[in-house]
Amino acid sequence: MSVLISNDAELDTLLDAQEVEHICGVVLAAEGVEREVEISLSYVDEDEMHELNHEWRGIDRTTDVLSFECDSAFDEDIPADETLELGDIILAPQVIARQAPGFGNSSADECRLMLVHGMLHLLGYDH
């Protein structure tokens, strides 16, 4: 598994790269994904997240996490030796940190939850 992390705005990401990779790996293992996957994780500021949420979901406000699935981890038509591009997760650390106390979480714990939430969306879960 590889996780490509971008943080162009140099935001406080709340989690380090090693923890991000660990969390993604735990989710993949729990869901029975045994093949090689690539995940993209981007940290964006609140304004950019607002724009993305409006553009892609038609919702004119910011949000904490967005996910965009590419290849399905369970697509049997993709050769087993090929790396799957699982998709993109976008996190807004400012939004996550602001909402965390309302859920009784630390900012880092809330970010962990949002990363798991995003991973589950990449694996086909919806709410």
Task: Give the ranges of each region predicted by the language model.
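An acidic/histidine-cluster motif and surrounding catalytic segment
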Residues: 1-112, 120-127
